[in-house]
Amino acid sequence: MRSRWSDLEADKLSELDLLVHASRLIGAETSLVVWGGGNTSLKTVERDHRGRETAVLRVKGSGSDLKSVQRKDFPGVRMDDILALLDRHEMGDQEMVDYLAHALVDVGGARPSIETLLHGFVAAPAVVHTHADAIVSLTNNDRARDVLDAVYGKDVIALGYRRPGFRISKDVADTIAEHPEARALLLERHGTITWGATVREAYDATIELISRAEDAIAERKRGRRIFGGPRVAVREPAERRALALALAPRLRGRLSRARRVIVTFDDSAPVTEFASSIDAPTVSQVGPATPDHTIYTKRLPCYVDARELADASALTAAVEEALRAFEREYTAYFEAHRFPDAQLSDPLPRVVLVPGVGMFTAGRDRRTAGIVDDIYHHTIDVIGNASAFGRYVSLIAKDAFDVEYWPLELYKLTLAPPEKELARRIALVTGGASGIGRAIARRLAAEGAHVVVGDVDGAGATRTAEEITGAVGAGRALGLAMDVTSEASVREAFEAAVLAYGGLDILVSNAGTAHSAPVASMALEDWERSFAVNARGHFLVAREAVRLLTAQGIGGALVFIATKNVMAPGKDFAAYSAAKAAQAQLAKVLALEGAPHGIRANIVNPDAVFQDSKLWSEDVRRQRAAAQGIAVAELEDFYRKRNLLAVRILPEDVAEAALFLASDRSAKTTGCTLTVDGGVREAFPR
């Protein structure tokens, strides 16, 4: 492993800033720590609130991530309070948390790491703790002690697995005291502890320790067949994609029975090689690489026995059977190891391995599903490396359970922001590059939805998606070119949604076009163009959505953005009004057909939404002004004055109506028409 340390950069930094710097260097190495794992510390002397010099431990706070950690993420704990505990023999978890809260230098500061006492009990000023893949590879095999002796000799000491907390902190301190010549300590099936007189020394010790492990692994793996070789042939990319498209919605529906999840698909070479191997059915069911992975991946993945299955329907049935088996076994695992106050979480898997196809991962959002995927990649690496030395081993089931349901570990998950109204939902919005569609996409995303933005203007759709991800986070939106008049283009857009997020919950069918002319002078191509976009387009999009929602089996919402003209057509606006009337009838039929499947279909009728609108082109403005006998400059004010409230209708107003119909606030509403027109009496629904 290459050291990332730069004296040029480090020489400018003070003690605490140096700790932040080193922590980020460690966090940048994903083979050392992943997604909030690991911690670092530095013992300093600071002045307290009375100006007295006080020995303080600055340690990473619980839930913060080393790769992006800041000064504020290192709460200070008084060392005299920490060292006073060396005389204790036992201390409960909650007692430890409460004690450390009273020992904080900064009142109301971040909660210190659950491994704070471990850092404090080590005498050296600087301490680094990682969950390095290379080290865990050496300890997670049945020859671990022999392997460690061969790689490190007497330089490094090893400690058998213990759950983080007071007991392991005491044991680490005692073990280091008994071996003063040791340069590092390895926690079996957990990670590393290195130390030094300075942050640089502790960092260098970590890099040197890992490098020796990596060299040993590379030497041991040379010429060896990994995972026993193939058991199932890896299918061709096109076939894997087709099977993923068939499996993902059904899998997402099954995993979302209690709470919806986002599902991602990974058919990268490391994943398919592992999932399709001879060893995978066995080694995948041994356990996690490190205990902290369990809060994301659970103890085990769901392995689907797909050796003899050729088509999507047979594979789907096998996945369903594997999920039922996983649920039974997970529930039994919980009952066998539960402790007082432990509450059964979702008993379904976060990782599903399908030989020959790839891996599906599930999470509360795209980011979390990605974390699960990333962690399992590391697990695959560890299994492969450890198996080169002997039989892969992991935590016993009871130890894994105690971490998976440990309140101090679960605390990290409580630091996430509260879920919003549309959290865990997937929406597809057509015509999302501008105007109403853009406003709806942004509004749904603001309420937590993952949004696929489709538009014939692909670049505009991408811009909308980038606006969304800039506001709410990476992975929350996808922009793509989508022509709603093209069956192939519509199908490709829905496939993109499935591959990105696993399925669909909300369709907002909004794309439209307008042409104004008297019937007598209208060209056939203009009439047909209006029906292609404003009628056929909604049919193609809705048909694909209903197929997908039905496959998922968890209901959904269809929201059609129609127009006031459905109820009150306008002079010289026949092509638009007639096509939009067809759209509205389609929506009502879908309310009838979708109800048995929990699929709701509703309509929004806006009027005269000019802002950011491509529908109201200069030609259409000119044509509509002529039809009303007014100047073009008077058009917007004319429409405002004709509604009862005399208000201008904005895209954001329509977005609020779409949000209502897309959300559970309207869970008992279908076949409804909601007007957003300021009150046009001719367009009253009843």
Question: Predicted segment positions?
Answer:
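Glycine-rich flexible loops
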Residues: 1-427, 439
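Substrate-binding pocket helix/loop in short-chain dehydrogenase/reductase
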Residues: 518-519, 526-528, 621, 639
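Short C-terminal tail/terminal secondary-structure segment
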Residues: 658, 670-686
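Alpha-helical segment proximal to the catalytic Tyr-Lys
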Residues: 547, 592-593, 667
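Short, small/polar-rich loop/turn modules that mediate ligand/substrate recognition or access, typified
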Residues: 508, 595, 600, 669-671
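Active-site loop immediately N-terminal to the catalytic Tyr-X3-Lys motif
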Residues: 520, 568-574, 596, 646, ...
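Active-site helix of classical SDR
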Residues: 542, 579-582, 587
